[in-house]
UniProtKB/Swiss-Prot annotation:
The gene is nusB. Belongs to the NusB family. It comes from Thermus thermophilus (strain ATCC 27634 / DSM 579 / HB8). It comes from the Bacteria. HAMAP family: NusB. This is Transcription antitermination protein NusB. Involved in transcription antitermination. Required for transcription of ribosomal RNA (rRNA) genes. Binds specifically to the boxA antiterminator sequence of the ribosomal RNA (rrn) operons.
Length: 151
């Protein structure tokens, strides 16, 4: 269910960024789109999933400056304007989660790659994986601080 919640958050952030909608309006729009059964999912998103998606979005917005700075420092040779907006939305939420949520790194990165593959272009999954692996190396080297992770 968390993967689907992350997809909801990504779709809302994408609509907010690209469509110029307010964040709450974008969230409601994405929630309505995902309200029914969707390809690859047997059940609609539950309230816990909706709450988790909201937490990711509000957390990213609260830490947007720091998350974007980390991404800019990590993504070499890319400007946010050049990046596919789906990839950017996935990366922003994943980096927020890496730094500020207790989710373990490996499943978080794995799900981000799957979402990028589903919504992005041909090379989105490998691009997202490479960027998040570099963020992880920065964390492991002590360059970036994170909250304690769940076991």
């Amino acid at each position: 269910m968390r993967r689907r919640a992350r997809e909801l958050a990504m779709r809302a952030l994408f609509a907010h960024t690209v469509g110029g909608m307010g964040l709450e309006e974008a969230f409601q729009h994405a929630l309505e789109e995902m309200g029914g059964e969707e390809e690859g999912y047997a059940e609609p998103l539950d309230q816990e999933g909706v709450a988790f998606a909201r937490r990711l979005l509000s957390g990213y917005k609260a830490h947007q400056e720091e998350v974007d700075r980390v991404l800019e420092e990590t993504v070499e040779g890319w400007d946010f304007r050049q990046m596919a907006k789906t990839d950017l939305a996935v990366l922003r939420l994943a980096v927020y989660e890496m730094l500020y949520e207790p989710t373990p790194f490996e499943p978080l990165i794995e799900v981000a790659v799957k979402i990028a593959n589903r919504y992005g272009g041909e090379h989105s999954g490998s691009f997202v994986n490479g960027v998040l692996a570099r963020v992880y190396r920065r964390v492991a080297a002590g360059e970036l601080k994170t909250v304690a992770k769940e076991a």
